[in-house]
């Protein structure tokens, strides 16, 4: 029974009875209470957090402090694109300070360090040290946990197959996994044809508020957009294939307009089936029948 990190993937050959997954907390303190309720109900479950803990609401510091503690107790904490933007700013690479600041980076710096800290000051912080030690993906025999997605084909875990350029941006394995949207969802992006999942594993992601998901399946079924205050857990799945499970509950939305988008804490069994979901509407959790 081993865990090892290769290509920013934490690979685990064990199958746990249950997994607790939460992504896209975005500084939302209320989400921490949902996690604690899930941990109380499933005390032996493996906690996996899927990225985007910063940039958004007012409790970024409390969220990262909580995750640092949880990791020390065995939680698996993954990176999202917002953490990567923070690291890019700290490492003074690319142009991510502009993109990150557009996505609430200044507010995150003020919450973490009391000011809009310089890259050097950020590199000296415990938060930088913590985030640099986080992998991008966690893979079990039956499940892939990742922030944005992986290519839903047989070579999903082969870094060499990801290299490309899109609208001037270099796409590689790490970039895809934290930023992927349409390329992960669709086989035909123009016509929004929902792709098959050929990885033979359930893929559990955050990154995109589930209310914006839409598309058409090969068999004619439709996935329609939902209202922005209804970011429930959703699946893209064909018969006989494992699901792609989307969990982002919309915590990066305006808290004055959508105050109860507190995220979705999802409990899965070892096969990757959803067992229970905790959110604002169901803080004690709702059981799910597959």
Describe the predicted segments one by one.
Residues 1-66, 70:
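N-terminal active-site segment of His-dependent metallophosphoesterases
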Residues 22-23, 47-51, 77-81, 146, ...:
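Active-site neighborhood of phospho(di)ester-bond hydrolases with catalytic His/Asp-centered motifs
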Residues 16, 42-45, 72-74, 141, ...:
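A general structural motif
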Residues 56-141, 166, 170:
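Active-site neighborhood of divalent metal-dependent phosphoester bond hydrolases
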């Amino acid at each position: 029974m081993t865990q090892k990190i290769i290509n920013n993937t934490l690979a685990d050959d064990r199958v746990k009875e249950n997994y607790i997954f939460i992504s896209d907390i975005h500084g939302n303190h209320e989400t921490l209470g949902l996690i604690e309720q899930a941990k109380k109900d499933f005390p032996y479950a493996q906690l996996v957090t899927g990225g985007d803990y910063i940039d958004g609401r007012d409790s970024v510091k409390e969220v990262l402090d909580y995750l640092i503690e949880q990791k020390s107790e065995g939680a698996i904490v993954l990176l999202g694109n917002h953490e990567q933007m923070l690291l890019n700013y700290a490492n003074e690479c690319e142009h991510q300070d502009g993109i990150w600041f557009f996505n609430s980076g200044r507010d995150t710096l003020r919450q973490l360090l009391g000011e809009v800290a310089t890259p050097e000051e950020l590199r000296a912080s415990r938060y930088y040290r913590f985030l640099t030690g986080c992998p991008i993906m966690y893979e079990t025999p039956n499940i892939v946990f990742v922030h944005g997605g992986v290519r839903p084909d047989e070579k999903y875990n082969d870094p060499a197959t990801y290299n490309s350029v899109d609208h001037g941006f270099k796409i590689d394995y790490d970039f895809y996994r934290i930023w992927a949207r349409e390329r992960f969802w669709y086989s035909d992006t123009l016509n929004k044809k929902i792709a098959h999942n050929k990885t033979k594993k359930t893929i559990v992601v955050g990154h995109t508020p589930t209310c914006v998901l839409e598309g058409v399946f090969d068999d004619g079924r439709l996935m329609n957009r939902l209202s922005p205050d209804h970011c429930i857990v959703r699946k893209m799945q064909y018969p006989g294939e494992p699901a792609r499970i989307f969990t982002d509950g919309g915590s990066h939305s305006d808290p004055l307009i959508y105050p109860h988008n507190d995220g979705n804490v999802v409990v899965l069994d070892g096969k990757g089936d959803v067992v229970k979901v905790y959110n604002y509407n169901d803080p004690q959790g709702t059981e799910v029948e597959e």
